[in-house]
Amino acid sequence: MEPQVTLNVTFKNETQSFLVSDPENTTWADVEAMVKVSFDLNTIQIKYLDEENEEISINSQGEYEEALKMANIKQGNQLQMQVHEGCHVVDEVLPQTVVEKQATARTGKKPLAHYSSLVRVLGSDMKTTEEPTAEARSPVPCDTDKPQDKPPDWFTSYLEMFREQVVKETVEKLEQRLQEKLVLQKPPFSSSPSEVSMPISEEETLFLPENQFSWHIACSHCQKRIVGVRYQCSLCPSYNICEDCEAGPYSHDTNHILLKFRRPVVISSEPFFYSKYPTPRLPAALEQVRLQKQVDKNFVKAEKQRLRAEKKQRKAEVKELKKQLKLHRKIHLWNSIHGLQSPKSPLGRPESLLQSNTLMLPLQPCAPVMPTLSAAFVDENLPDGTHLQPGTKFIKHWRMKNTGNVKWSADTKLKFMWGNLTLASTEKKDVLVPCLKAGHIGVVSVEFIAPTLEGTYTLHWRLSHKGQQFGPRVWCSIIVDPFPSSESPVNLERDGISSSKADDFTCEQEEAFLLAEEEIPLGEVTKQTEGTGSSAPQKTQHAASERELYIPSVDLLTAQDLLSFELLDINIVQELERVPHNTPVDVTPRMSPLPHDSPLIEKPGLGRIQEESEGAGLKASPDSTVLTKRKAETPASVEETEEDLSGTQFVCETVIRSLTLDAAPDHNPPCRQRSPQRELQLYSTEEQQPLMLPGFCRKDSSLKFALPEEGPHGDEREEIVHIAEEEAIEEEDVQDEEVQSQSSASSEDYIIILPECFDTSRPLGDSMYSSALSQPGLERGAEGEPGIESGQEPAEARERLPERESQPKEQSISDILTTSQHLDTVPLVPEVAGLPAALSRSAPCGQYEAPRVDSPVTIQEVLPVPDHVRGEPRGSTGLANSRQKSCDHSRHHNGSSIAGGLVKGALSVAASAYKALFSGPPVTAQPVISEDQTAALMAHLFEMGFCDRQLNLRLLRKHNHNILQVVTELLQVNNNDWYSHRY
């Protein structure tokens, strides 16, 4: 939009300013008309001053636009204009005719008197039939067509005289005829006494004192006749107000511009008008009458337009009212039919109700309300991506809000749309929803069964009322985990548990996580029999429920639950997260948080322990040395033998053999046999706990709890220890080359050289759990403690428990692995084996030393805790007493083995999980660390690239010389420094 331009117009030392607010829509004709009206001029010539103060004429729209551009650019939106009055071409002989006839210029019709003046101007071009002399003399100027003959002067003067005479006579003739015509039309002016008096009275009213003009128009505001200045709306021609009303308040759109008129035309000098030509009074009266008629015509036309517009508006209002009435009828009809169709009232004829409603509709001015069906999603109980076990029964709840204005009835259902998830009842494609009123919130529930195959499953639903769908689409999306072999029906059936009960137990474990808010009490009765390997099936009593779903409390979960849910997923989560202190998110059931002093850092290659060729020191092929590969190479008969062991018994056997170190290497164990040349045995240091077996990482491996078998005696164990120490010293240099940094990528594989004397036919890590679960005074107390047979009843162990708790320094049985009475397996019974006093007393205390192979561990059944008392986390069901770090036998004499640190790092994740399951709060007792061991740890840290000696020493003291935690914190510090320097 162009800026506003101010026009400073000067005429005879009188200057007026005009503000052109919209130059684009203001034309030159508008400006010229405004100037004429403002200065009371008829013929004008407007000129503007350019930047050199030169006057330039404006006669067209293009010149006017050029002037505006110049004003915008060079004169600051100001345009100086000069107005010059144009010369009249009408002769002074008949000025009164021009004056009177120009009074009708704005009416659109010009009288004959004006054309008579044009005849005088045109001269000989006019040919009148009344003057034969003009016809006779007209051929005379035809001789002037010859360009070579110039007319003489006398001829030219004669023609001018003739022209004036012809024009004068023609005008007089026309005026005479006009006067005769007016006399014949005298009846309209019959109110006047005579022909002469009427024009006089009209003249008196036409020219009032002070040179004011009477418009014979009523003011649109005060309804009086306008005399003098008249203001007419530029947009509404029918709106006219007088000068007094314009000065005060008036009812009209303030945005409309009012045009000011003093008189229709410029009034000439009156004395000359009256003295010389008194006769043209009749034409003046005629013009006044015609003006009034034109004004009346315009007024009538405007009034008709106004009435027409009002009529259209009334029609539109009537149409809108009819539409609203029709809408009211539909609404009442729908409500009446809906009310009659309710089950409480029989269906009747709504004609009478409709008629009564239609009669009363005009009396109800309420706004129309359309019946709308709408819903909004509020909340759900199972978020997308929830992990479930195959065959799990669960119920998905959606909280929905009725956001419409129609109450949900029995016809409102949750309709199945599409999906691949299995319904508990395949016939129920439409689920009933609660009858919610408008604005209320309810719960819509659907029962599902997790498919047997792993994968992601989704099912979509939408609300529907009588076949009309509405509201948002809701869905249930779950992730079905693969069926672990430890819980497969085949293995459980071979252990004496039917496949159906195994599936139910899996479902029950899942329900504890999915529907914990709808817990159903569970009573479990476990029958325990004497013996080392016999177990009775677990008997569960389900509470009465229509859905037959078992929803146990979290506190009722047993060690089997913890092992099957916690340990199986540790390695998988570590591969995904690779962050310390990271707890598995989607693992079910919920677990207590792990201690912060044992972060989850693990290499996924721990399950693939490779073997190095003895002679050349070269690495063997990873595919040929993976433990799981070796299992596949064994004969089918051996596999069948191994499958007799369930997954939980396998884990239990591993843990028990790690704790009860009185068992000798069994060369005919129930698990897979391996050749002596390829036997490997993991070992741990003081902080090392359970090793993550390949079965924990691979979902097709089997885990099974089993009771300990007869082991070697003390002399055999002592011999094994010495052999292991000698070979560890010899191969330390070879292992040093194989050591990987604790902070390296998680995809690395470790190659660990172990002595051949280690029996790998048994579960991995015979003693890896012992050091973390035994007391420092274990060896001292073991000497005087008599052995307890493996078949001892749990009651005897319960009697011994208070005594041991009251005398922690004198007990010979250390921390106890407690298996809840809810397990299907036979309860673990305490078993104590003797140890040579010389060996136990000579064992030096050290945290980073080779693992004990000969420390006795007592397994004891603790008193069962009543269900109503169980409110502590699951970790509290593990050991009765808090653990302390023990003193171990050293495999090397002058420093800790790098291989020991490597194995400790490899077993860190399993240790953390085991501590979370079976240990209490960490003990603050710090073992004595020698300077040589500290120096070895410092050298190990330098090898890893951590060369800040002061920081290393400070972190070693902070973490009790736990190199794993030191490396973890160093990595975190380095990462933080990298981020701070980068950003």
Curated annotation (Swiss-Prot):
Domain of life: Eukaryota
PROSITE patterns, per the entry: PB1 (PS51745), UBA (PS50030), ZF_ZZ_1 (PS01357), ZF_ZZ_2 (PS50135)
Annotated region described as ATG8 family proteins-binding, given as residue ranges: 544-638, 745-756
GO biological process terms held by the UniProt record: macroautophagy; negative regulation of osteoblast differentiation; regulation of bone mineralization; regulation of stress-activated MAPK cascade
ZnF start-end (ZZ-type): 214-266
Presence of the UniProt keyword Nucleotide-binding in the record: no
Key words, A-Z: Cytoplasm, Cytoplasmic vesicle, Lysosome, Metal-binding, Phosphoprotein, Ubl conjugation, Zinc, Zinc-finger
InterPro entries (UniProt xref): Ig-like_fold, N_BRCA1_central, PB1-like, PB1_dom, PB1_NBR1, UBA, UBA-like_sf, UBA_NBR1_C
Function: Ubiquitin-binding autophagy adapter that participates in different processes including host defense or intracellular homeostasis. Possesses a double function during the selective autophagy by acting as a shuttle bringing ubiquitinated proteins to autophagosomes and also by participating in the formation of protein aggregates. Plays a role in the regulation of the innate immune response by modulating type I interferon production and targeting ubiquitinated IRF3 for autophagic degradation.
Subunit structure: Homooligomer and heterooligomer. Interacts with TRIM55. Interacts with titin/TTN. Interacts with RNF29, USP8, MAP1LC3A, MAP1LC3B, MAP1LC3C, GABARAP, GABARAPL1 and GABARAPL2. Binds to ubiquitin and ubiquitinated proteins. Interacts with SQSTM1. Interacts with TAX1BP1. Interacts with IRF3; this interaction mediates autophagic degradation of IRF3. Interacts with IL12A and IL12B.
Identification of the protein by name: Next to BRCA1 gene 1 protein
Organism: Rattus norvegicus
Gene: Nbr1
